[in-house]
Structures are given as C-alpha cells and as structure tokens.
C-alpha cells in the first residue's frame, strides 16, 4: 500500500495540464535540476528547496550549491548562492564555516559580505584580514595580488549600507578610514580596476586585459569616449588577432540589448557580434539537435526573460554544431518549426529567429512526433538520427493528447519504440522553475536534468547519459567539488 501511496502522491500536473512528477524521488536531484532556474523565485522558495536537499544528503546539497555559484566550472548563479549562504549562516553555521575559505574561489570576494551580521561574521573578518595582509605583502614585493580589494566596500561609497560595512571592516582590521582607503587604493591600482580609469577619463588601458563583464557593461562608454581605439580593438578581435575575454559573460546577456529598445548603432552591432563570436565553444561536435520553447509562459516577468535565454542558447549551439543539424534548431509552442539560422551578424540572426516564436501553448509532444514522422517517412537509419536532443524550456508542457495519463517522456519513449527507433538521449534544460515538478524520475534511462543560462552545461553533457542521478553524481563527484563538504 505504501508503495502505491508514494507513487500517487508524487504525481502532479504542469500549468498546461500534462501529467508529471512532483519530484524525481531525490530531493538533491530536484535541487540540482532547478538551481540555475530560480532567479525569479522568492528567497523562501529557494531556501526551502535547499533545506529539503540538505536533509536528504548534506554533502551533496553543499556541492550543488557551490556548483551553482562556480563561475569557472559551474553555472555562475549569484543570487541563489547568496540567499542560501545566509540561510546556512543562520541555520547550519558549522557546515558553512567548513567552506567559507572556498567562497571567493568559486565566486567572488563580495559573496562573503552577505555573511556580515550573522554568526559567521567573525570567520569572514578573519579571512579578510588574513588575505589583505598577504596582498599587502605581495604588493611590497612587486608580486600579484588577489581581487579582494576590488570587491571590498569603500568608506567613500555612495551607498550608506556599503559605507557602514566598510567602516566595520576597517575597524576590525585596526585601521581608521584614511588608512583603509589608502590600503584599498594602492591594491586597486595594482589590480588595474577599469572603473578607476573610467572615473578619471583615462583611456590608456589595455582592452585585451579587461574582464568580460566590464568590457560588455561599459561598451557605450568606450564607444563614446574612446571610439576609434575601441573600434580598432574590436576589429582585431573579429579578425582573430586580438584577445577578448568572454568567460563569465552569458549568451543571453549579449543578445539582450536587441530587445525592448529602438535602433542599435552599427558600431554597437559590430562590437556585440565580435563578442558573440569570441565565446568559448562548449558544444563538443555531436550530432545533436536543440529544441527551444517559444511559448507564452517563457515571456514571464523575469530578468532575464526565459525566452531570451532559450533563444541565445539555441543559436549558440546550432551555430557551433558540427553534426548534421549545424545551423538549425527547432522552436516549439503550438506547432514545432525547424529553423535555419539566417543573418550576417548576431543582431540579424536573433531578429530572424525570434519571429518564429508563436508565444502560445507548450506542445512538446508534436516536437517528438515531427522528428519520428520524418524518420519513418524517409526511412532514416538510427545512425542518422540525432544522438541527443536538448529541450530548453520552463517544463510547463501541454498534456499528451494521445494518452493524457502518460507523462510526455513516457509517451515519447513508447512512440519511438512502437516504430522501431531508439529514443535519442534527452536533456531537459530548465530556464524557469516556477513550480516544483520534474519531467522524469531519478533513474529514467537516457535522460539528464540541468538548468541555468550557462553554455558550459553543453560540455558536461558530451558523454553518454545513463540517468538523471548518474549525471548529477558525475558532475558533483568530480575533483572540482571534492573539498566541499557539510
């Protein structure tokens, strides 16, 4: 009886009436599958999801948290990380204290500042004092320093909370305001923070050495105040003779300026296109197909808009795809459409591809039926079928019209089997987890669950996929997260 009761209690429906699961049957996997898709959710919702995972397996929950923040090897989520850090400080401080030393390594030094005013404040101040002393010694020796000084608050900041926090940190370091300001100024000069140059209208810096976020954020200032030199640099980037950092810049951030505004200048188009083309290729050369959700629910009031994230990832992958589906993706809402990317630059490509979004319902069933119907009609051999299908969506699918008692994945498995085809590996990529529901369960075969805005996820999915849980363990069990424990 208990077995059947658990099964029944785990069934729910999407916003569009499809049968689906409340949980994968693993709280940790539920968190892993959605932690990159919680940007629009309330703090309480975020911490509740983490709490459940922590209760199931504290170590896995902590590894998932640091994977979510990891700007070099993970998915680079800042707000969800900081929200959970504060919850840990108030509820599981000992667990958090074991990992405080890794916070800046996986994220930034200012992530630590959310712990001020909590029971972990002393540990944070001790770490800051230790690192600042090491940086000052390195400065005197002419060696490189950390980015701590960049992210510490200034005593002359415009924000009152930042000033109050800066004064508190200064006193804990045994410094008055002047000493603190002088120390940070010297270290920031060594770091060569571009904001200092902009404030002083000093455009003698090297563009190739600037961080990716700053280069994109301040592009208008560069065009306005250093137009010729900036143009020349971006031209060299486009030619491949100059380096432009794009490591922490997400694809959606690059195309976001194309929406909700008037004309964009030729100069800005050229700069954004060069930036787009400089992105690292995480695709891996598989014969895979990207399917992006263009339904109405993908246009909810979030920043970023889920539809923009999905479109950016779809174009990113299709352009770099070396398989049979190079330069193609499928967009779906009421009716799936195979879209060939057209345009001379990323601005034109986005404008062209975006108009295929129907902004209607979310009929994923028709996507798989289109793929299978095409294969059957043309007697396509299994080897020519896509090896993987990436479904980038909010997972609020329509119900199966053929059998509304089945989940979409169950229906698709049965459909392919009935026609003698093996279902390609399916990657459910969540970009907006509004509800606690999952399209598959923990041990379903040939499927993975991921989330977020980061194209690095494509590289994690290169190998053969066994099950959602196996994929999660492959990621979190890597050497990268070995030191993170609860």
Task: Give, region by region, the residue ranges found by the protein language model.
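Long lumenal/extracellular ectodomains of secretory and single-pass membrane proteins
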Residues: 1-309, 319-486
